[in-house]
């Protein structure tokens, strides 16, 4: 039997998936350092909550496992992250079997890093892997076939080989190899969205911190906006502000001025702001996922 299936899965209790709301107080904007005199975000508690939510959503579905290539879903289930460059490569993935622990395939050095620094994951469940890199690696090399057969073997050992697996996003050649390995593919994104829909108190605290950072960014814009400043100048200032305050993904800063405001182009240029211009800004960023 595969080593991954020998050890008992981590048991998530009802208390683990208690969101711990306290609506009798205002939502806190917590500091980001760990301190001994205040309870702040408990990241291990948040991991167990998220894993429990995903497991419960999986149990409520007709799926035998979830196969996740979406970076947001991978982070939700495993509490792991590498650089933003990997977000669109579709070459890290997680398999969550019904009643089991998440198994993560990542770039080789990242997998070793997870074994050292992510003790909430079983070391043997942090595996090196590579598939298509969005077509960069030709399927003829056999990497997709290898990993599809590997996952089929794991699901057989987990007792769910005949049940469909839910996938969030996937390269077509990888899906074809999974089907050749005898697996039935269904939509798993809706199952994950149902799991992620209800936020815990820890997640809400992080959302509030992210919003506070954006509040500060808008105040910076208010201070810096004047004739002669270019749209891209504002974008650079806001990116610096957010990353200095701990943002892990500034997805976009829309900075639009003057005649560019209508119709909305959804990007920024080097246009210089002039007196009396209408201006529009939109900030998309995340803090701790």
List the model feature ranges, each with a label.
Residues 164-167, 221-230:
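Conserved short loop/turn motifs at secondary-structure junctions
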